[in-house]
């Protein structure tokens, strides 16, 4: 399925498939890497789970309105159910567990832990019956080494229960990505994405409200950060991620989880004055090398299929 935008928008996407994949990867790498900083600011007025739920719920509604105006092929009941299931995994459970864990785990440490998603994606692919080559296992292992270096260099702290919750969130994300690549979802990318994040966000919002989460005093910068998370970090990035899920392997689509911590650390250094140690530099090289290897081995596997 080709990704099309209304002709009235002054935006031209790359014409080649590889160009669109590169654009989508750039979005999920840079935007999701910046969301940790935005979350840090938004928490000044929003409690974690309510922020996650509202951000996805509103983004889902906005994207649904946009998709509906394009006169898409409307989904069947089964496709809506599948979109809700994937959204529950990617948004409701994954983001919910991340929000729960971040009550006791720092933002930088959380970003590093979320980078375990490709490991879970590889394990899930193996359990599902795909033969995983030694090269792919090596690439994942190398990425985890880089994550460990980055975590050590950043002085990671947090409770064991919070860390476990975040790792469970990473597992749910990998599971959702796996399901998204195998279930029949709405054919229109925008409509499919809107249903996934909207339904997942609705679930998170209900859970947050029932658990007693309420907004604190409203301030300008937290609201601005929330709008960034909703419009860019959710609407734009999830469309890009959905495109990757449909046109690449789950492991490649999840490779952003390796790069996002590097972006988060860089933004923290530039905007928050956080120190960049030699461990951070070494980890950056190792992590990016692991991503390159993931691309290479996946390309070879697809070429020999």
List PLM regions with ranges.
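Juxtamembrane helix-entry segments on the extracytoplasmic side of multipass membrane proteins
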Residues: 17-22, 44-53, 75-81, 137, ...
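Transmembrane alpha-helical segments that form core, pore/gating elements
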Residues: 59-63, 120-123, 127, 140, ...
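Glycine-/small-residue-enriched transmembrane alpha-helix faces in small-molecule transporters
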Residues: 2-53, 96, 100, 155-182, ...
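Hydrophobic transmembrane alpha-helices of multi-pass small-molecule transport proteins
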Residues: 63, 86, 116, 132-152, ...
């Amino acid at each position: 399925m080709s990704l099309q935008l209304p002709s009235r928008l002054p935006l031209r996407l790359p014409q080649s498939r590889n160009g669109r994949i590169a654009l989508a990867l750039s979005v999920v790498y840079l935007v999701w890497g910046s969301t940790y900083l935005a979350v840090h600011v938004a928490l000044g007025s929003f409690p974690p789970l309510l922020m996650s739920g509202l951000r996805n719920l509103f983004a889902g509604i906005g994207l649904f309105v946009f998709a509906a105006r394009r006169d898409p092929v409307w989904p069947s009941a089964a496709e809506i159910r599948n979109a809700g299931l994937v959204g529950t995994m990617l948004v409701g459970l994954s983001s919910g567990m991340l929000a729960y864990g971040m009550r006791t785990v720092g933002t930088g440490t959380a970003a590093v832990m979320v980078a375990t998603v490709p490991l879970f994606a590889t394990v899930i692919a193996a359990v599902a019956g795909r033969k995983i080559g030694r090269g792919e296992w090596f690439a994942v292992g190398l990425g985890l080494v880089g994550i460990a270096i980055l975590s050590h260099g950043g002085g990671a702290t947090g409770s064991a229960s919070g860390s476990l919750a975040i790792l469970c969130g990473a597992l749910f994300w990998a599971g959702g990505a796996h399901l998204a690549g195998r279930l029949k979802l709405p054919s229109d990318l925008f409509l499919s994405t809107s249903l996934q994040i909207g339904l997942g966000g609705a679930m998170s919002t209900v859970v947050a409200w029932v658990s007693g989460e309420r907004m604190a005093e409203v301030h300008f910068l937290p609201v601005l950060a929330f709008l960034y998370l909703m419009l860019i970090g959710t609407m734009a990035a999830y469309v890009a991620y959905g495109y990757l899920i449909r046109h690449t392997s789950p492991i490649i689509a999840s490779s952003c989880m390796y790069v996002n911590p590097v972006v988060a650390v860089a933004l923290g250094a530039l905007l928050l004055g956080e120190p960049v140690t030699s461990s951070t530099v070494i980890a950056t090289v190792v992590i990016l090398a692991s991503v390159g290897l993931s691309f290479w081995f996946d390309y070879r596997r697809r070429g020999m299929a």
